[in-house]
Regions:
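Extracellular-loop-to-transmembrane junctions of the mid-late helices
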Residues: 64-106, 140, 146
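Membrane-interface helix-boundary motifs at transmembrane edges
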Residues: 11, 40-54, 111-122
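Short juxtamembrane and helix-loop transition motifs at transmembrane-helix boundaries
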Residues: 15-20, 82-91, 108-120, 135-138
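Alpha-helical transmembrane segments in multipass membrane proteins, preferentially the mid-helix core
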Residues: 34-38, 74, 97-118
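Interfacial "cap-and-anchor" motif at the non-cytosolic start of specific transmembrane alpha-helices
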Residues: 109-168
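Alpha-helical transmembrane segments of polytopic membrane proteins
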Residues: 18-29, 88-101, 151-154
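Hydrophobic alpha-helical transmembrane segments of multi-pass membrane proteins
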Residues: 1-40, 57-75, 126-141
Length: 179
């Protein structure tokens, strides 16, 4: 919706532009947080542990949400919408990019740290998700105006789903033994 109303003048277009861009910012950082929660749950298979760790994992998300909510009052922390209803990102957008990189790095850390702890992970496709998503974030950061991150998130989720499906074909979920 944000791209459809950007630069268009009609009743409520500016408000729609603010709200839709705010949802995009929150959605993007939410994807990083949810990925970390998924990795935690997938590795340890323990909801209680995941909820305990969520208190730490949610911090970058909260910072981003607070900044986006402040932005709705016209502060221009994350982005500005001009009088002509044209979107322009500002320096605060770096917080979102940094948050995503933190989430990506943390998910990779979780996998490698759990392997050192002796958790049995045959193959966990953390790079299958992080690789395309990171590429999308970098492209979107460098080339203003393109939205490659969401397309590459979809590709990454397909990679992860395919790997999970392939693993479930040859491994018993209950015992962890190979078929």
């Amino acid at each position: 919706i944000a791209f459809l109303v950007d630069g268009k003048q009609f009743t409520g277009s500016r408000q729609i532009n603010y709200i839709s861009n705010s949802i995009c910012f929150i959605g993007t950082v939410s994807m990083g947080m949810l990925w970390c929660m998924y990795v935690e749950l997938r590795i340890y298979r323990n909801y209680k542990r995941m909820v305990q760790k969520a208190g730490v994992e949610i911090f970058p998300w909260l910072v981003e949400v607070i900044m986006v909510l402040c932005n709705l009052f016209g502060t221009g922390i994350m982005f500005k919408i001009s009088g002509e209803n044209v979107y322009q990102r500002t320096a605060g957008v770096l917080v979102g990019y940094i948050s995503l990189v933190i989430y990506f790095a943390y998910s990779i850390y979780l996998v490698y740290h759990s392997k050192k702890q002796g958790v049995n992970l045959n193959f966990f496709p953390v790079i299958y998700f992080v690789g395309p998503c990171f590429a999308g974030v970098v492209l979107q950061f460098l080339f203003y105006g393109i939205t490659s991150s969401w397309v590459l998130v979809a590709v990454a989720l397909i990679f992860v789903q395919m790997q999970s499906y392939a693993e479930s074909l040859y491994m018993d979920e209950l015992s962890g033994l190979y078929n």
